[in-house]
UniProtKB/Swiss-Prot annotation:
The chain crosses the membrane at residues 29-49. Residues 1-24 form the signal peptide. It is a single-pass type I membrane protein. This is Uncharacterized protein YosU. It is found in: Cell membrane. Residues 50-81 are cytoplasmic. It comes from Bacillus subtilis (strain 168). Its main location: membrane. GO terms for cellular component: plasma membrane. Residues 25-28 are extracellular.
């Protein structure tokens, strides 16, 4: 049941990401990116708890790459608040 819930929530996030990518509102895109980064960090911590270090490291690397790619947009969002 938990796996189905994770898959459904990730699919909803994917749809939100695609929608926000084509919408003129860039803040929505950054918010969705931050939510995805939070999920990736959570999955990475969960993998480290389960002693799956390779997958945990992979989640953290993907999250860090996502942060560095969108760093300018994140800074713009923080300054606009």
């Amino acid at each position: 049941m938990r796996k189905i819930l994770k898959i459904v929530s990730l699919l909803i996030l994917l749809l939100l990401l695609v929608y926000s990518f084509f919408s003129p509102n860039s803040q929505l895109f950054v918010f969705v990116q931050l939510i995805i980064i939070a999920f990736l960090i959570g999955f990475g911590i969960n993998c480290f708890v389960k002693k799956e270090r390779y997958q945990g490291t992979l989640y953290f690397v993907i999250a860090i790459c996502n942060i560095t790619i969108n760093l300018d947009k994140i800074n713009e969002l923080i300054q606009s608040i």
